[in-house]
Amino acid sequence: MPELSYREAVRDALVQAMRVDEDVFIMGEDIAEMGGSMGVTQGMLDEFGPERVRNTPISEMALAGAAIGAAIQGMRPVAEIMYEDFLTLATEQIVNQAAKHRYMSGGQVTVPVTFRTQGGSGWSPGAQHAQQLEAWFVHIPGLKVVFPSTPTDVRGLLWSSIYDDNPVVFFEHRTLYGIKEEVPEELEPIPLGKARVHREGDDVTVIATGRLVHEALAAAKDAENDGVSVEVVDPRTLQPLDEAALVDSVKKTNRCVVAHEAVVRGGFGAEVAAVIQYQAFDWLDAPIERVGAKFAPLPFAPVMEKFVVPHANDVLDAIRRTVGRDGN
């Protein structure tokens, strides 16, 4: 099997979709000659030309609106929002237009647009280039929200997002672009709404997203030294959410930790905790633990950034608390 980085897997999904379907095109700020801020689309201009690899003005609302219009007319645009923080500038179009047209038209109008964006900590980007805003969009009926954590998943889920007839907000974490793994020779679409169990265990379920999937896996290895068997589950798709997979795991382990890089208060983990509380309360042997960033803008200074966002040791501490081995 070939080995691809997360970045290469994103590009591969885009290239393959554009090769087989002329209705698929990409657009965004500096995505053509420059290849985007993270280099994901490098070389695609040479193969597909400026009509299908379209640089846009520096206006997220304008590029989102243009992408939505193209989708309504039957195209399948993939619009890159350079930084996740800049989704705030496109929110009117994504939330009030893309998410609403299918409902308002009684299903007569579909909006098959994918909004790719990236964010997160790890390289000291500062407070305005590193937010994790997935919870905002999970709250909006009509949107699908995807957050892959591995090259295999990002490739298969991006393909499925492009060919979904609903608008998808597709989150990528910048620190994952360099990770590599073997992927299937042929691209295998992954259905939206299906979670993935990365590691099986018996004592605690850790439900994690994005970068925190990898932190959770590291914490699970450390927990073995305590004699604790940890199951790590990645929802992959935040909306629709594979509630059954999450609940089944917690019913097996009887304990749950929810981890994400976004701020804890109001984060996606609160919704996951509510789902577990409603559907698996009688199986819980301990309170649900939540892990996330502190309630503060992300600092520019690397040492302060590391202090604000969660890491493997924070997940491990939560695991120990939920099994009663935190030393207290």
Task: Give each language-model segment a name.
Residues M1-P167, F171, K306, ...:
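Thiamine diphosphate
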